[in-house]
Curated annotation (Swiss-Prot):
SUPFAM superfamilies: Ribosomal protein S7 (SSF47973). Belongs to the universal ribosomal protein uS7 family. It holds the Pfam family Ribosomal_S7. Part of the 30S ribosomal subunit. Contacts proteins S9 and S11. This is Small ribosomal subunit protein uS7. It comes from Acidiphilium cryptum (strain JF-5). GO terms for biological process: translation. GO terms for cellular component: small ribosomal subunit. Transmembrane segments: none annotated. The gene is rpsG. Disulfide bonds: none annotated. It comes from the Bacteria. InterPro entries: Ribosomal_uS7, Ribosomal_uS7_bac/org-type, Ribosomal_uS7_CS, Ribosomal_uS7_dom, Ribosomal_uS7_dom_sf. The lineage of its organism: Bacteria, Pseudomonadati, Pseudomonadota, Alphaproteobacteria, Acetobacterales.
Length: 158
């Protein structure tokens, strides 16, 4: 990894339906083998079913962002070698990484669910995340619990 230049952040274009950059980024993480149209149909289908379940005045984009906010971790542990021992040091998570982790965790836990289509899995996982339950929220809680347990090593921060 080069120390001279940091990689330039690529600009992600907003999605065509809602004009939201975060939804576009979510689609890019969900996408397999460059099949963006498949990822789009899954995400839009999941957001449509969220709208149907939320009532007539439910905004699917607002629910999506609420689900993401409920999954975003505030703190995580990173390994730090001191002497011969490796310590799990709790560190605060940068905002970009928070979003990336939340997106990744929601998609991972949606893929592990038992519903028939990915659209259903994703909409149910997002609904669970809005209501502060589900596998993605549990992952965030586990991360926070791990950081809390290793609070004693927080002075090893870098």
């Amino acid at each position: 990894m080069s120390r001279r230049h940091s990689a330039v952040k690529r600009e992600v274009l907003p999605d065509p339906k809602f004009g939201d950059v975060v939804i576009s980024r979510f689609m890019n993480v969900l996408m397999y083998d460059g099949k963006k149209s498949v990822a789009e149909s899954i995400v839009y289908g999941a957001l449509d079913s969220l709208k149907k379940r939320g009532g007539q005045n439910a905004d699917p984009v607002r629910l999506f962002h609420e689900a993401l906010d409920n999954v975003k971790p505030a703190i995580e542990v990173r390994s730090r070698r001191v002497g011969g021992a490796t310590y799990q040091v709790p560190v605060e998570v940068r905002s970009e990484r928070r979003q990336a982790l939340a997106i990744r965790w929601i998609i991972e836990s949606a893929r592990k669910r038992g519903e028939h289509t990915m659209e259903d899995r994703l909409s149910n996982e997002l609904l669970d995340a809005v209501n502060n339950r589900g596998a993605a929220v549990k992952k965030r809680e586990d991360t926070h619990r791990m950081a809390e347990a290793n609070k004693a090593f927080s002075h090893y921060r870098w």
